[in-house]
């Protein structure tokens, strides 16, 4: 738990530096349900105004990916002109996050979209992700 706290503290500091001068607070969107504990710990460490929202996206049945992405719960926040941080606990292939990023771009018109992930399983990566910090667990 101490290591997780240190990771959240470091990421929170980096995110604060990135967004503290924003006119419009950034929106942190948690991908439920797995991201909830990480997102709660992370946003406690962000020391600038933010908005939060969440989505529920499914592409798995049990432990296997179906290849079909379903948006089960959409966001409720207007993202127009805002920076967005998608918060996820684990990234595997990246297909679902890439789909969601494009969905947000095409439907909500944010200024910018970043992805913040706790654990990166690089084994089957299908997309590139921007890393705030290189973290090895």
What is the predicted function of each stretch?
Residues 1-137:
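PRPP-associated nucleotide enzymes
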